[in-house]
Amino acid sequence: VMKQAGYVTGSVGKWHLGLGDGAVDWNETVYPGAKEVGYDYSFIQAATNDRVPCIFIENGKGVGLEPNDPLYVSYKHNFPGEPTGKDNPELLRMHPSVGHAGSIVNGVPRIGFQKGGKAAQWKDEDMAELFLEKANKDKPFFLYYGLHQPHVPRVPNQKFVGKSGMGPRGDVILEADWCVTEFLKELDKLGLTENTLVILTSDNGPVLDDGYQDQAVEMVGNHKMAGPHRGGKTSLYDGGTCIPFLLRWPAVVKPGVSDALVC
């Protein structure tokens, strides 16, 4: 729709909308992908932070993959000799609470199993700055920026470690806030602020324990993550389905607050 209206389009960050058609060979061009749904440029995760393969996909190609170390992925079984969160807890810097007992990447156990592609594996702490760099690269008029924070595993950049006083979850929320601020600064620098519509929203309600032992439950205190609502992520209650929807368009939208239901 955006391309038909003449927009240059880009997608950067967390994807989780599916790539490929059935069995995917990650060492070749992954098709279909972001391009096939209308994006001129994409630099995305193959899935989410906590799922294999833990590599970036740029315009359908795995970033940094080397022919002599091909990447193999399975969601059914591990590859012989590859360490996992279940069998090798001594290798972990973050331990799972449920569901994340597969391949270990960057000291964090993931969902699923992967082998090879070592040079292409991401470093969780560096994602925010890398995504911002890619988001600003071509300055697309329509940009979908899927924030990877505060999705699990909650591994903050070193500059945010311990800064919130609320553990890793609080730290990555600070990092997400920084990411949004830096993006808005870029619009200011380009002189695009007044006539650019910025929408900040989410795909689900909040969550504390989302599969890793990161002190989120212990350190939340009296804070009500979903405000007055019951439930959270994965729940059918309002806490799971009511999400923030923030707009900024200085030339058109006047500041204000609305409780209207948007579907």
Question: Where do the language-model regions lie?
Answer:
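Formylglycine-dependent sulfatase
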Residues: 1-263
